[in-house]
Amino acid sequence: MNFRVGQGYDVHKLVDGRKLILGGVEIPHPTGLLGHSDADALLHAITDALLGAVALGDIGRHFPDTDPRYKGADSRVLLRAAVALLAERGWRPVNVDATLIAQQPKLAPHAVAMVANVAADLGISPDCVNIKGKTNERLGYLGREEAIEAQAVALVERVG
């Protein structure tokens, strides 16, 4: 088998006193995401998609929130570490398609920077990374601006 697909998901609560970081981009907003690391839900979902594609579990298995080494960790560092795990096993990312669901803030103005970061971390062209922003039409906890959710799918291929 030369190709595999993985799916990833993450959600974090919005709270006062935290920076909002998505796709490695700091987004101006009065609240940020709560988490052990920088709580970048987008990168966590992408990391899970990549790990899942090669049956390596999920982000919590490799970078547990019980480990003080990952307190406040930059999720871009974790994503690059996941890519290295794939490479050790003979796999590389081909493309990623991700969706961020947030009532606020508007994410489209930050999409180009997020795509550039993800592409750089995965070692692929920006035209192989797609990031979409959606609202939840004011429904549920996402619509009440209590959290931000991320979903991602990744295609990987065997190298060599």
UniProtKB/Swiss-Prot annotation:
Required co-factor? a divalent metal cation
Question: Which pathway does the UniProt entry assign to this protein?
Answer: Isoprenoid biosynthesis; isopentenyl diphosphate biosynthesis via DXP pathway; isopentenyl diphosphate from 1-deoxy-D-xylulose 5-phosphate: step 4/6
Kind of enzyme, top EC level?
Answer: lyase
Q: What SUPFAM superfamilies does the record point to? A: IpsF-like (SSF69765)
| GO molecular function, a single term | metal ion binding
Swiss-Prot/TrEMBL keywords: Isoprene biosynthesis, Lyase, Metal-binding
Q: Which residues bind 4-CDP-2-C-methyl-D-erythritol 2-phosphate?
A: 10-12, 36-37, 58-60, 63-67, 144
InterPro entries tied to this protein? MECDP_synthase, MECDP_synthase_CS, MECDP_synthase_sf
Where exactly is the site Transition state stabilizer?
36, 135
Q: Which reaction does it catalyse?
A: 4-CDP-2-C-methyl-D-erythritol 2-phosphate = 2-C-methyl-D-erythritol 2,4-cyclic diphosphate + CMP
Q: Specify which residues bind a divalent metal cation according to the UniProt entry for this protein.
A: 10, 12, 44
Q: Key word Lyase present in the record?
A: yes
Entry note: cofactor: Binds 1 divalent metal cation per subunit.
Query: Which EC numbers characterise this protein's activity in its record?
Result: 4.6.1.12
What the record says about family reads: Belongs to the IspF family.
Q: How does it assemble?
A: Homotrimer.
**HAMAP family per the UniProt record, alphabetical:** IspF (MF_00107)
Q: What is this protein called?
A: 2-C-methyl-D-erythritol 2,4-cyclodiphosphate synthase
**Gene that specifies this protein:** ispF
